[in-house]
Amino acid sequence: MDITQQKGLTTELHCILDFTNLGYSCLTPIDDSSKYDIVVDLGSKFIRVQCKTASWTDDTKEKAFAIHTNRQTTNTQKTTRHKYTEDEIDYFDTWFNEQGYLVSIREASGVIFTWRYEYPSSNQKQGIHIANNYKVEEVVKGIV
């Protein structure tokens, strides 16, 4: 297993543990053909979740972190990026800095989704996603 696969698996396991600690069951596909990593049984409904490894953003180190909201396939000739659709997944989940974060695919429609711990010094609010609003335990309350 290469380091990228190891990081992805670690993120996925943290996401599963996060939902499990909240009292929800998680289901995983038996093969790699599914676009989602886990299905979470929220009791009243199931959600398809794609787990993504987050990292600090280069220009705002320790103030913002982000995930790539696409997937890529690689063969001997090229790497191709693919966008997820609402027919494939419902949410993106990540585990970052000891906390799980969940965002719907509708909201994370770009190539990168960025969370910030606070508003920028310019006090810009439009298009800014404050991390506390996306904690898994808070988002799930709005789903069930």
Residue positions per predicted region:
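Mixed-charge (Asp/Glu-Lys/Arg
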Residues: 1-34, 40-144
